[in-house]
C-alpha cells in the first residue's frame, strides 16, 4: 500500500484512512488536532484515482462488493503484518467515511489491530459480524444531517456491536452534515486525550 509516514517523538501511532476522493495527505491535519508527538502512518486507498480514490469498490445497490472488499481487507492485513509496530505502546486507527467503513471491515477480521478506533461518519453496511474484543475502545461519530448515512441504521449497528462484541464502543452525534465540524473535532480530541492519559 502507498502511504505517508511521519516519525514522532512518542511511542504512539496514528493510522489514517481517508474518505472517498482523499489521499494519504488528506487527514494529516488531524495529527495537529490530536497528537503532535505521535508518529503517523497515513494510507492511500487502493481503488480508483483522484476524486474516485477509496479503500474498496463502490457499493452495488447499496451493498458491498464482497469479493473486492475481502480482497482489499486481506491486502491490508498482509501489509500490516509486515510493519514493525513493536515500538508503539498505543495505536489508534482513524478513518473518515469510506476509510471508517474500511476499518469496520478490518474489525470483522482482526479486532485487536489497534488499541483505539475513531470512526468518523461511517455507514451501516452489510459487514460480517466482528469478533469480540472487550479491550478495544471505539468512537463512532455521526452527522445527523449527513445525506450519505442512515442515522437509525448506524445507531442500531453500534448498539449491536456494543452488546455483542465491543462493550467499550460509543456513538457521538453532531447536528451537522457529512464533514468534521469544530465541535466534533474538539470532542474527538478530548476523547483521544483521555485514552492517552490512561496509558501515561
Feature locations, PLM:
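Serine-hydrolase catalytic machinery in alpha/beta-hydrolase-like enzymes
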Residues: 2-87
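Active-site signature of alpha/beta-hydrolase-fold catalytic machinery across serine-
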Residues: 29, 105-109
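Flexible "cap/lid" loop of the alpha/beta hydrolase fold
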Residues: 52-60, 122-139
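Gly/Ala-rich beta-loop-alpha elbow adjacent to hydrolase catalytic centers
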Residues: 94-99, 103
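A conserved short beta-strand
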Residues: 112-124
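C-terminal catalytic histidine-bearing segment of alpha/beta-hydrolase fold enzymes
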Residues: 139, 155, 168-200
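Short beta-strand/loop motif that positions the catalytic acidic residue
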Residues: 139-146
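Conserved alpha/beta-hydrolase "acid-adjacent" motif
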Residues: 147-154
Amino acid at each position: 500500500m502507498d502511504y505517508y509516514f511521519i516519525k514522532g517523538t512518542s511511542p504512539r501511532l496514528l493510522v489514517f484512512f481517508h474518505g472517498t476522493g482523499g489521499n494519504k495527505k488528506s487527514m494529516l491535519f488531524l495529527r495537529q488536532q490530536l497528537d503532535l508527538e505521535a508518529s503517523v502512518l497515513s494510507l492511500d486507498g487502493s481503488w480508483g484515482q483522484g476524486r474516485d480514490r477509496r479503500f474498496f469498490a463502490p457499493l452495488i445497490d447499496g451493498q458491498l462488493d464482497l469479493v473486492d472488499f475481502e480482497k482489499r481487507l486481506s491486502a491490508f492485513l498482509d501489509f500490516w503484518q509486515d510493519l514493525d509496530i513493536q515500538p508503539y505502546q498505543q495505536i489508534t486507527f482513524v478513518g473518515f467515511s469510506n476509510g471508517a467503513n474500511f476499518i469496520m471491515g478490518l474489525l470483522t477480521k482482526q479486532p485487536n489491530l489497534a488499541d483505539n478506533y475513531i470512526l468518523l461518519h461511517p455507514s451501516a453496511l452489510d459487514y460480517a459480524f466482528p469478533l469480540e474484543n472487550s479491550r478495544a475502545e471505539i468512537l463512532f461519530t455521526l452527522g445527523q444531517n449527513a445525506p450519505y448515512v442512515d442515522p437509525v441504521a448506524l445507531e442500531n449497528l453500534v448498539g449491536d456491536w456494543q452488546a455483542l462484541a465491543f462493550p467499550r464502543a460509543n456513538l457521538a452525534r453532531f447536528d451537522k452534515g457529512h464533514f468534521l465540524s469544530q465541535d466534533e473535532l474538539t470532542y474527538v480530541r478530548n476523547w483521544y486525550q483521555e485514552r492517552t492519559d490512561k496509558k501515561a
